[in-house]
Amino acid sequence: MNMKEPISIILLESALELVPKELWKHPAVVKNARRRGKKPGETLLDVSLHYHAMKKLKDKEKRGRPDIVHISLLNALESPLNKEGYLRIYIHTYPGHIIFVKPETRIPRNYNRFVGLMEQLLIHGKVPPDSDDPLLYVKTMTISDLLEKINKNGIILLREHGEKEKPENIVKYAVENNYAIGIGGFPHGDYSQEIISISKAEFSIYNKPLTTWITISRVIVGAEHLYNII
């Protein structure tokens, strides 16, 4: 199949955000921020550090897992699909931001360096902060706004209870209809009703829950097979 356009993958409602204001004074948040020489609101929410602070946080089961985005981006950006120029990946965060990622971006393999990079991005809006052509930049917009910006007709979802299908066929369906492919960027729970309501179709690649990074890797491999990249 001759692919004219790269496939677009959106990590949806990703568990990547700065510590929300209502948690700034919690001892666990203050302790971690002080240790790093930062203000509480300039640090990433991380359940491994802020578990007790997050107990009463809305949708706590979906939040505070920056490692999901880290591993997923490493998988995606190092893939043959991306190296051949046929992948565009976007990060939609739980608070409603969209992170635009240039295909040539090299994500730090070290998790602590990744955390620092994401904090810089969410504080300054782009990385590098003084660049006119940043590798990463963030905007506040809805998924519908993003789909319009990247000229997609809609979005399909990878969801546990979706129609069982092979990754290769899911990619083919998305490309033929000019749809983006949405994958949940959170550890537990389900998409919000807002996301579900705009999806054009829902698919599943396995009969049990899969991590985000396994799902994205399988979709990418499906695309690589479909377009004879590997």
UniProtKB/Swiss-Prot annotation:
- Annotated transmembrane regions: none
**Residues at which S-adenosyl-L-methionine binds:** G184, G189, I205, Y206, N207, K208, P209, L210
CDD domains to which the protein is assigned, alphabetical = Nep1-like (cd18088)
Recorded catalytic reaction(s): these are: a pseudouridine in rRNA + S-adenosyl-L-methionine = an N(1)-methylpseudouridine in rRNA + S-adenosyl-L-homocysteine + H(+)
Which cystines does this chain contain? none
Residues flagged as site, Interaction with substrate rRNA: R65, R106, R109, R113
What is the E.C. number? Answer: 2.1.1.-
Record's keyword terms, sorted: Methyltransferase, Ribosome biogenesis, RNA-binding, rRNA processing, rRNA-binding, S-adenosyl-L-methionine, Transferase
Q: Name one GO molecular function term.
A: rRNA binding
Per the UniProt entry, what is one GO biological process?
rRNA base methylation
Physiological role = Methyltransferase involved in ribosomal biogenesis. Specifically catalyzes the N1-methylation of the pseudouridine corresponding to position 914 in M.jannaschii 16S rRNA.
| Subunit | Homodimer.
Matches recorded under HAMAP family? NEP1
Task: Note the PANTHER family from the entry.
Answer: NEP1/MRA1 (PTHR12636), RIBOSOMAL RNA SMALL SUBUNIT METHYLTRANSFERASE NEP1 (PTHR12636:SF5)
> What family name appears in the similarity comment?
Belongs to the class IV-like SAM-binding methyltransferase superfamily. RNA methyltransferase NEP1 family.
Q: What is this protein called?
A: Ribosomal RNA small subunit methyltransferase Nep1
- State the organism's lineage: Archaea, Thermoproteota, Thermoprotei, Desulfurococcales, Desulfurococcaceae
